Regions:
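Interhelical loop and helix-boundary elements at the membrane-water interface
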Residues: 1-19, 69, 75-93, 129-149
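Membrane-helix interfacial "entry" motifs
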Residues: 2, 36-44, 113, 135, ...
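Membrane-embedded alpha-helical segments that form the functional core of polytopic membrane enzymes
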Residues: 20-66, 101, 105, 116-129, ...
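Residues in and immediately flanking transmembrane alpha helices
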Residues: 25, 77-80, 155
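Juxtamembrane transmembrane-helix termini
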Residues: 29-36, 70, 111, 134
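Multi-pass membrane catalytic core of lipid/isoprenoid biosynthesis enzymes
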Residues: 50, 68-121
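A feature for the membrane-embedded catalytic helix bundles of lipid/isoprenoid biosynthetic enzymes
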Residues: 95-160
Length: 160
C-alpha cells in the first residue's frame, strides 16, 4: 500500500487530474459548442488525454530521477526515489509511460491522417527529458520550455 502511495506521489497524481480536466473542459466547453465536425471520436479524444497524462507523468518521473542528489540535501523527508521507489523502477516506469504515449500518439496521428503530428509527442517527451537534464538550471530557457509545453497541451486539444 505504501508503494502505491509513493507511486502516486512520484507521478504527482493530483496534477495529472488537473491536466486531464483542463483538456476535457477545453474540449467540451470551448471547442464542441462551436465546431460540428470532429475528427476524433470521444473515445479517441480520451486517448489523446491519456497520452498527455502519460507524457506529463513521465516528465515528473525523469525530473525526480535527475533531482535525487539535490533532494538528498534539500528534501530528504519528501524524497521518493531511492527511498520507497528505486531508481531502476522509476526509470522503468518512465520508459513504459513514454512508449505507451508514443504508440497512442502515433495511432491518434494516423486517425487524423497526419503522421507528422506524432512529432508533437516526440518533441514533448524529448523536451521534458532535456528540461530535467539541462534546462532546469536556466531560469529563462527552463521557464520558456515549461510554458511552451503547457500551452502545447492546450493547443493539442484544438489541433486534434
Amino acid at each position: 500500500m505504501n508503494n502505491i502511495i509513493s507511486f502516486f506521489k512520484l507521478i504527482r497524481f493530483k496534477n495529472l487530474i488537473i491536466v486531464a480536466l483542463t483538456q476535457l473542459l477545453i474540449k467540451f466547453s470551448l471547442i464542441n459548442p462551436f465546431l460540428d465536425n470532429f475528427i476524433l471520436s470521444s473515445n479517441q479524444f480520451y486517448l489523446l488525454v491519456l497520452t498527455t497524462v502519460l507524457i506529463t507523468a513521465s516528465g515528473y518521473i525523469i525530473n525526480d530521477i535527475y533531482d535525487v542528489k539535490t533532494d538528498k540535501i534539500n528534501k530528504e523527508g519528501s524524497r521518493i526515489i531511492g527511498k520507497s521507489i528505486t531508481s531502476r523502477i522509476a526509470i522503468s516506469w518512465y520508459i513504459i509511460f513514454n512508449l505507451l504515449a508514443l504508440v497512442i500518439g502515433i495511432y491518434i496521428s494516423c486517425i487524423v491522417k497526419n503522421t507528422y503530428y506524432s512529432l508533437i509527442f516526440i518533441y514533448c517527451i524529448f523536451s521534458l527529458w532535456t528540461y530535467s537534464k539541462r534546462m532546469k538550471t536556466s531560469f529563462l530557457f527552463g521557464n520558456l520550455q515549461v510554458s511552451l509545453l503547457t500551452a502545447l497541451s492546450i493547443f493539442n486539444v484544438a489541433l486534434f
